[in-house]
Amino acid sequence: VPELRFPGFTDDWEERKLNEVSDIYDGTHQTPKYQDDGVMFLSVENIKTLTSNKFISREAFEDEFKIRPQRGDVLMTRIGDIGTANVVETDEDLAYYVSLALFKSEELNPYFLQASIYAPFVQDQIWKRTLHIAFPKKINKNEIGQVPINVPTLAEQTKIGSFFKQLDNTITLHQRKLDLLKEQKKGFLQKMFV
């Protein structure tokens, strides 16, 4: 049981393995043939925004992707950068590379799962299961499934997930403001000093 909880929640949390509470998939192992439009193709470098300027054909998507990311699923990096997660928030078709793991769960709130992946205990478990001798380093899909997470009731998951989603939104907003201020400062420095 965590030391900090929202009021009204007293039930015990249950330790479960990720593969007990979620189906886990990885993306295509084939290097795709990119084109100017079609189905957006995601890789490790796209995890923060889940947007990309790489696309594959609709035909390649239909052939390669039987299991597809959908709204409410979670994608996590598993090759190179490991353990960075994001929630799919679009209804558009998305294709994804082998470097990403896809979580589909009926039991977990997606924002709770994302926050859980970032929890120090889970990051430590992911790190322990990572093949550090590989280049780039990676964690196999089966090893991801063995990672334990602590799971409360769905109501508490939803409350926690909403809390962390709001925090992330606030951080993003302030980051944009900070970036804008830095650009303004740069402009002032260029114009005020000759």
Q: Where are the predicted features?
A:
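Extracellular/lumenal glycan-associated surfaces
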Residues: 2, 156-170, 174-175
